[in-house]
Amino acid sequence: MIPFGGTEIQHRFLSHYVDDKLLDNFQICTSIPGKVELDKNKINILWQKNSYDQPNIYPWFEDKTNHDKYDWYIFNSHWNYEKYRYRFDIPTHKCHVIKNAVNNFPVLTPYKTGDMVRMLFHVTPWRGLNVLLGAMSLLQDCNVHVDIYSSCKIYGEDFEKQNEEKYEPLYEQARRLENVNYIGYKEHSFIQKFIYRYHMFAYPSTWEETSCNAALEAMAAGLYCIVTNYGALYE
C-alpha cells in the first residue's frame, strides 16, 4: 500500500482538474525540497504542506542559498506561510497561498431529537485521540457514540510497521469503551461514501495542523465540527 494522506489527496485533485498539457509546464515537488528533481525547462514549484519544524525540511530552508532554487512556494494555509516567512525569511514575492480543496458534498442525514449522536474521528492517532477517548470516558451515560477510523496505515505499510505498535494502548482503550467503536484504517473513498451518516466530527487536536482535509471534508458534508484552534485549524 502506498501512502494516501492529505498531500496525496490534493495532488490527485490537481491531476484530475487541471489539464495535463498545462501541468506539463510545471515541475511540482510536494513538501520535502529535492524530493523531485528541479527541471530547468519548467517552472519549479515547491508545494509546501508540512510544518516548518520538520527535521527533513527546516535544515534546507535555514540555508538561504536554497531559496532561489524554486520559482514558486505554494502553501496550503496562511498560517503555514506565515510560519515559513517568519522563521526562514523566505522571498515573499515567490510565495502564494492556495488552500486545500474538497469535492464531496453529500446530503447529511438529519438529526432528530432522541437519536444517538454519531461522531466521527478519522485522523491519525497522535492528533488528539487520547484527548477524545478521555472525553468519551466521561460521557458514558449520554446518547453519544464515536466511530474511530485511526491508524498509521494511511502513510503506507512501512510507516505502519514502524509506528503502529506504540499506539496500541490507545486502540485498546478505545475497544474497552462502550460508546466507542474502534474500526481502524479505511480508505479515503470509504469515509467519503459514508460520512453523511454522522452528525459531528470530533477532533480535539493536539497537533499543529498546516491545514486539515478531514475537517474540510466534514464541514462540506454538513457535520458539526468540534476542533481546537491549533495551527491552521482556525482557518
Ranges and model annotations:
Residues 27-56, 67, 71-75, 96-98:
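Active-site proximal beta-strand in glycosyltransferases
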Residues 192, 215-220, 234-235:
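Short alpha-helical segment that forms part of, or immediately flanks, the ligand-binding pocket
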Residues 224-227:
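Short hydrophobic beta-strand element within catalytic cores of glycosyltransferases
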Residues 192-198:
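Short alpha-helical donor nucleotide-sugar binding micro-motif in glycosyltransferases
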Residues 160-186:
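Nucleotide-activated donor-binding/catalytic signature segment of Leloir-type glycosyltransferases, i.e.
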Residues 71-85, 90-107:
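Donor nucleotide-sugar binding/catalytic pocket of nucleotide-sugar-dependent glycosyltransferases
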Residues 1-33, 38:
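N-terminal pre-catalytic "stem/leader" segment of glycosyltransferase-like enzymes
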Residues 111-128, 133-137, 147:
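Conserved donor-binding/catalytic core segment of Leloir-type glycosyltransferases
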